Each structure stands twice: as structure tokens, then as C-alpha cells.
Design a protein with these regions (language model features):
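Phosphate/diphosphate-binding loops
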Residues: 36-79
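Acidic/polar loop patches that form or flank catalytic/metal-binding clefts of enzymes
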Residues: 13-22, 66-68, 135-139
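Glycine-rich loop(s) and the adjacent beta-strand/alpha-helix scaffold that form part
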Residues: 1-33, 240, 246-249
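N-terminal leader/propeptide and maturation segments of large enzyme subunits in energy/redox metabolism
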Residues: 96-156
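Short, small/polar residue-rich loop motifs at catalytic or cofactor-binding pockets
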Residues: 52-54, 194-196, 236
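Short glycine-enriched, charge-decorated loop/helix-capping segments at active-site entrances
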Residues: 111-115, 233-238
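Gly/Pro-rich active-site capping loops and adjacent beta-alpha segments
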Residues: 65-94, 215-231, 235-237
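A glycine-rich dinucleotide-binding beta-alpha-beta segment and adjacent secondary-structure elements
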Residues: 137-233
């Protein structure tokens, strides 16, 4: 478990914090997942708590409102932002809603034996099953969404298809299909924090800097300990690249250090 020990230890020796301190990488996760993401489960099963097919449907918060453009971009460019967006909603949860047209496109994690969801044959019935959510507001939002779908553009989940909504204050820019084919399913999600975007400021050689931008002798940082790498966005997998690049820099810098 990452509990920020590195940041605390750095601060104790005068390290400068840096970057988007209140930002984080957060993945939409099953609201009712096992504690700590199921650390006692095999790694192959833990990943099944992810729920990142929101782009094939819509997400509603407790007020029954949409709060992100689910089709803004490919999920690899949006999932970390949208996980944080879920955490910022009332109650720190949301519902991902789909109809039968996309059921075979949902990732295997949605069919995991421990996946939590509700199902109904009508949108009215589904909205009544959305625990913690205003059912009338939810139905109104879904009606407005359905009415706004652009039928002139074909649906293509393999590209930014431009199949959008029209006239909504918050659009869906791609992959907008009407929710009109039962059964309808809704999956409750929260945001699972992987790491924070804020961290310690480092030099080009990986040395941790103090508040005067002077290196702290013998102290180096790499990976998610380094602040200022990510801000409002996160391309999938780039955290691994960051760890590799900054890890190499820090290792080489430490090897050349007189301490």
C-alpha cells in the first residue's frame, strides 16, 4: 500500500514538494470491490475490479446527472481523469449505464463473477434500482441524452467516430448511442487511487531538491515520487515509462554521488 511515506520522509529532510499536489491517477473501480482492491486475490483477478468501458454508455452521479464527456477520447487517455471525477461526485460514486447493444463489447471485467450491477427491462425500472441516486432526475437525464444522439453518424468503437450528441450542455463527443435496447445494466463505481501527481522536485540527475532548488546530498527519487510529470491528463502506461526513465536517471546519479 502506498501511504505517502516517501513524501513524508522527504519533507522531514527539507525536500521541496512539486507538481499538482491535489491531482491523482484514479481508475473507475467496482464500488463494492474487496478492501484495498482485493490484495489477497491473484493479480489476474484483482484487475477485474476495473470498470473502464464508460465510453460505451453514460455515467450518472447521485444527483442523476452526467458529469463527464464519456466519449471525449479513447479510454486510455481519459480513465485516470474520470476515476478522479467520480471521486469528486456526491458520495464519491457513480453508475455506468449500458444497454444490450454493447454488452458483447464490454471488457471481461464486467462479466467477472464478483462484478456488481443491477439489471432491468425498462429504463424506469433501472433508474429505481440505482441505489443512492435520484431516480426521476436519472430518467430525465437519460431521456435528454437519448433525444440528443446524432443518428446521422455510424457507430464505430474502433475509432473516434464522431457519433455525438447535439444540444446538450455536456456533450458526448464519440460513441453516442441511444440507450434503447433491453436489458439495461448499471454498474456502481468509485475511483481507485493509484498514485498522486504531486511529489518531490528533482534535478535532471534525479537528485531531490530543497526549497532553494539545491540538491539534498545523497537523496534521489524516481517514478511516482517525482512531482510535476503529470497534471490534468495521463496517457495509459506512461507511469511505467516515467519510472523507467527517472529510475535510470536516479540510479546513475546516485552511483556518481560522493555519498
Amino acid at each position: 500500500m502506498n501511504t505517502g511515506d516517501g513524501l513524508v520522509m522527504g519533507a522531514q529532510v527539507g525536500a521541496q514538494t512539486y507538481g499538482l499536489i491535489d491531482g491523482c491517477h484514479a481508475t473507475p473501480m467496482d464500488l463494492h470491490m474487496a478492501d484495498y482492491g482485493g490484495l489477497g486475490l491473484p493479480a489476474s483477478e484483482r484487475k477485474n475490479y476495473r470498470k473502464i468501458c464508460y465510453f460505451l454508455g453514460v455515467m450518472l452521479n447521485a444527483s442523476g446527472d452526467r458529469f463527464v464527456d464519456e466519449g471525449a477520447n479513447f479510454r486510455n487517455y481519459t480513465y485516470a481523469q474520470f476515476g478522479k471525477a467520480v471521486l469528486e461526485q456526491p458520495g464519491h460514486f457513480a453508475w455506468q449505464i449500458f444497454d444490450a447493444k454493447v454488452d458483447d463489447l464490454l471488457y471481461a471485467e464486467y462479466r467477472f463473477h464478483d462484478a456488481h450491477f443491477v439489471e432491468a427491462d425498462t429504463l424506469d425500472e433501472l433508474c429505481e434500482k440505482l441505489d443512492g441516486t435520484d431516480p426521476q432526475a436519472a430518467r430525465s437525464t437519460l431521456d435528454a441524452y437519448n433525444a440528443a444522439v446524432n443518428d446521422a453518424v455510424p457507430f464505430d468503437p474502433t475509432s473516434l467516430d464522431g457519433k455525438n450528441t447535439q444540444g446538450l450542455p455536456l456533450p458526448k463527443s464519440n460513441w453516442a448511442q441511444r440507450l434503447d435496447t433491453p436489458p439495461f445494466k448499471a454498474y456502481p463505481v468509485t475511483g481507485g487511487i493509484t498514485f498522486t501527481y504531486g511529489g518531490l522536485k528533482v534535478s535532471e540527475t534525479g537528485a531531490v531538491l530543497d526549497n532553494s532548488d539545491a540538491p539534498i546530498l545523497g537523496l534521489y527519487a524516481a517514478g511516482e515520487m517525482v512531482g510535476g510529470v503529470f497534471f490534468e491528463g495521463y496517457p495509459g502506461g506512461s507511469g511505467l515509462t516515467s519510472g523507467t526513465v527517472f529510475g535510470r536517471n536516479a540510479g546513475r546519479g546516485a552511483a556518481r554521488s560522493p555519498v
